[in-house]
Amino acid sequence: MRAVIQRVSEASVTVDHKVCAVMRDGLLILLGIENEDNEEDIDWLCRKIINMRIFNDEDEVMNESLKSVDGDAIIVSQFTLHASTKKGNRPSYIKAAKPEVAEPLYLKFISKFQNELGKDVGSGIFGGDMKVSLLNDGPVTIIIDSKEKR
């Protein structure tokens, strides 16, 4: 399971000209799910993201976490995070989980994230053609892969 997390001042997700999530001051999380991903990956990645100290304290040092600053979040499914570009010019998505596997894991990730954070978060529409708007803060952008925890 791979996540690209971006610290943002604001973000929103729109599907079919309807806004389905809006937030201020927190994280926009792009989530890619692989064939082998499971609930252990969900647990580890949720804890890692929520507790990662990437928000500034009063001295402008990154010592605060999403949880400690009571920040918001939007989680967006993005299978293209598992693109392979080794051969040719057309990316291969063979490592990305099929929708019937990925969607339940995506929904479990959102549920676990909300439970760990202690508040509701926004999300995109799984498989939807989404328009994601954001205003980076920093910028701070970090890639986290649950396969690298071992």
From Swiss-Prot:
Coiled coil: none annotated. Pfam families: Tyr_Deacylase. GO terms for biological process: D-amino acid catabolic process. The keyword Cytoplasm applies. Its EC number is 3.1.1.96. One of its GO terms (molecular function) is Gly-tRNA(Ala) deacylase activity. GO terms for cellular component: cytoplasm. InterPro entries: Daa-tRNA_deacyls_DTD, DTD-like_sf. A motif (Gly-cisPro motif, important for rejection of L-amino acids) lies at residues 138-139. Keywords: Cytoplasm, Hydrolase, RNA-binding, tRNA-binding. It catalyses: glycyl-tRNA(Ala) + H2O = tRNA(Ala) + glycine + H(+); a D-aminoacyl-tRNA + H2O = a tRNA + a D-alpha-amino acid + H(+). It is found in: Cytoplasm. SUPFAM superfamilies: DTD-like. A Gly-cisPro motif from one monomer fits into the active site of the other monomer to allow specific chiral rejection of L-amino acids. Belongs to the DTD family. HAMAP family: Deacylase_Dtd. An aminoacyl-tRNA editing enzyme that deacylates mischarged D-aminoacyl-tRNAs. Also deacylates mischarged glycyl-tRNA(Ala), protecting cells against glycine mischarging by AlaRS. Acts via tRNA-based rather than protein-based catalysis; rejects L-amino acids rather than detecting D-amino acids in the active site. By recycling D-aminoacyl-tRNA to D-amino acids and free tRNA molecules, this enzyme counteracts the toxicity associated with the formation of D-aminoacyl-tRNA entities in vivo and helps enforce protein L-homochirality. Homodimer. PANTHER family: D-AMINOACYL-TRNA DEACYLASE 1 (PTHR10472:SF5), D-TYROSYL-TRNA TYR DEACYLASE (PTHR10472). This is D-aminoacyl-tRNA deacylase. It comes from Christiangramia forsetii (strain DSM 17595 / CGMCC 1.15422 / KT0803).
